[in-house]
Swiss-Prot record:
PANTHER family assigned: COLANIC BIOSYNTHESIS UDP-GLUCOSE LIPID CARRIER TRANSFERASE, UNDECAPRENYL-PHOSPHATE N-ACETYLGALACTOSAMINYL 1-PHOSPHATE TRANSFERASE-RELATED
Presence of keyword GTP-binding: no
UniProt function note: Involved in the biosynthesis of the exopolysaccharide acetan, a water-soluble polysaccharide involved in production of bacterial cellulose (BC).
Lineage top rank: taxon: Bacteria
InterPro entries, sorted: Bact_transf, EPS_sugar_tfrase
Stretches that traverse the bilayer: 81-101, 110-130, 155-175, 183-203, 344-364
Enzyme Commission number(s): 2.7.8.31
Subcellular location: Membrane
Keyword Acetylation listed: no
Gene Ontology terms, MF aspect: glycosyltransferase activity; undecaprenyl-phosphate glucose phosphotransferase activity
Keywords: Exopolysaccharide synthesis, Glycosyltransferase, Membrane, Transferase, Transmembrane, Transmembrane helix
Protein name: Undecaprenyl-phosphate glucose phosphotransferase
Family affiliation: Belongs to the bacterial sugar transferase family.
Length: 532
């Protein structure tokens, strides 16, 4: 949130140095009314004096910190949800097996409907019963006592519902104890087999390496050494140390800048800042500023946060209690959910739009010489480069792969068909193939070519917060586009408005927001006046 707020500050007085960063992270710990700021920005009021007054008096952000206890466990971001889905599948399988068994056992026809309804309602009761999902942490998921605590209440509740429904619907025909025990036996047996298989899989070396979170430590001295030693000895099943980094050199594996570059190539889940207490909080804030584009959770030893830090959440990280400074914008589960939606929607769209795509390709081929598709390098997720697909809308000998010159409304490089498909945004449709390849999402910040400039500067130079856009997959459309921020980036203010909207989308992401943006794109943006 602090990066979003600072994006607005960036639109006004262009400051630099530690003083500006201190302002940024003060705002980072406060709730900022983005709607008011966006309203002023849309009206063209980019000076700080035009923003709502009292920015420094905004109430402190409220965090609901996870309880800190002495348990030596670690919450994997995806595993609990996978176990819940596996339980749901097993219960459905148990219901099917129970119904099949009851038919084989020559159940009276009068009871068939009642048994079917009782099985279904019991399964629903199991799903709806509140479960203690934190009990699915590593290594608790392999403990029998913990799993009994997790499974016993919903199974018992499902059994009660089964028996109650069966008695209410079939009391004239009589109900035997056997019928009540059948549901319980099948559910318990299948869940038991599931847990045995799951425990075996979790203990395999391959799965252990996959589930372990990759951790990097920033710092030097005894504190960093102690942290690294503990991770390498007592926490090997939960965490894997990728290295220690520090600008002072010594025995470290590189500098902070080298860590930032390495994070682009090698997935890193968490970064722990572990400086000696003498370094102070300001040094921590400077390092956090340099990590603003890193796709990882950032923690710090609480002893370094001595100044006005009680608003920051504290989490258990193995045996350590660490202060959370920065979170990944989307969890692994959120990313899986978004990816599943992208794949499903893009396949359906390609099938539905196949006739239109064929006609457009034929028109481009007849209109001018050259290929139908145009590939251009763009900077995407985690600052990695990929080739984006578009319908060719320019003459082949005038194409600009690096986008050193942005397209203008009366650009002579655009063909006749190209002007039409650009106006209707049809030239972007081949990017559905980028979505299938995993390089893009349907909704997200629009990717830019490496040499795109705003106000005569490269985008990442014109606005330091620009790199934070790359912490999520780029999209075919986005929140900025449906709010009118598209087209040519002429000034830094144009870039600022777009980045503010992109970061607001990242902060507020949900599947429903993606669906809303897609429908608003169809409604508003296809005939946008800013498209050319």
């Amino acid at each position: 949130m602090g990066i979003i707020s600072h994006s607005i500050v960036q639109c006004g007085k262009w400051q630099a140095g530690p003083a500006r960063r201190q302002v940024v992270f003060r705002v980072h710990r406060r709730c900022f009314k983005m709607s008011e700021a966006l309203r002023h920005l849309k009206n063209g009021e980019t000076d700080l004096s035009s923003l709502p007054s009292g920015l420094d008096s905004i109430p402190r952000r409220i965090h609901t910190a996870r309880g800190v206890d002495d348990s030596f466990s670690y919450r994997h971001p995806v595993l609990p949800q996978v176990v819940v889905l596996s339980d749901a599948f097993c219960v459905c399988l148990a219901v099917v097996a129970c119904i099949a068994w009851q038919r084989i056992y020559d159940t009276p026809d009068e009871l068939s409907g009642a048994l079917l309804l009782a099985n279904i309602m019991a399964a629903g009761a199991f799903f709806l019963f509140p479960k203690n999902v934190p009990l699915l942490d590593i290594p608790d998921i392999t403990k029998v006592s913990v799993q009994i605590r997790y499974l016993l209440p919903p199974v018992a509740f499902g059994e009660v519902v089964f028996c109650t429904v069966l008695v209410m619907l079939s009391w004239p025909f009589g109900v035997t104890v056997r019928m009540g025990m059948e549901w319980l036996t099948f559910v318990v047996a299948i869940l038991f087999v599931e847990r045995c298989v799951g425990t075996y899989i979790l203990h395999t070396p391959t799965m252990t390496r996959r589930l372990a979170r990759k951790v990097a430590i920033i710092g030097s001295g005894s504190e960093a050494t102690q942290m690294a030693t503990r991770i390498n000895t007592r926490m090997q099943r939960m965490f894997r140390l990728v290295g220690t980094f520090d600008d002072q050199g010594g025995d470290s594996d590189g500098t902070v800048e080298e860590l930032v570059l390495r994070a682009r190539e090698d997935h890193i889940d968490a970064v722990i800042i572990c400086f000696p207490p003498a370094c102070g909080q300001q040094h921590v804030m400077d390092v956090l500023w340099r990590l603003r584009g890193v796709l990882a959770d950032v923690y710090v030893v609480p002893s370094l946060m001595t100044e006005d830090c009680h608003g920051w959440p504290v989490e258990r990280f193995g045996p350590f209690s660490l202060t959370v400074l920065q979170r990944r914008p989307l969890s692994e589960w959120d990313m899986l959910e978004k990816r599943a939606f992208d794949l499903t929607a893009s396949v359906l769209l390609l099938l539905a739009l196949a006739p239109l795509l064929t006609l457009v390709a034929l028109a481009i081929k007849l209109d001018s010489r050259g290929p139908v598709l145009f590939c251009q390098p763009r900077q995407g997720f985690n600052n990695r480069y990929f080739n984006v697909f578009k319908f060719r809308s320019m003459y082949t000998d005038m194409s600009d792969l690096d986008a050193a010159r942005q397209t203008s409304r009366t650009d002579p490089r655009v063909t006749r068909i190209g002007r039409w498909i650009r106006r209707l945004s049809i030239d972007e449709l081949p990017q559905l193939f980028n979505v299938l390849r995993g390089e893009m999402s349907l909704v997200g910040p629009r990717p830019h070519a490496p040499q795109t400039r705003a106000g005569g500067q490269l985008l990442h130079e014109a606005m330091e917060e620009y790199v934070a856009r790359h912490r999520v997959q780029p999209g075919i459309t986005g929140w900025a586009q449906i709010n009118g921020s598209r087209g040519e980036l002429v000034t830094r203010d144009d870039l600022c408005r777009r980045v503010v909207l992109d970061l607001e989308y990242i902060r507020a992401w949900s599947i429903w927001l993606d669906i809303k943006i897609i429908f608003l794109t169809i409604k508003r943006e296809i005939f946008s006046r800013n498209a050319f």
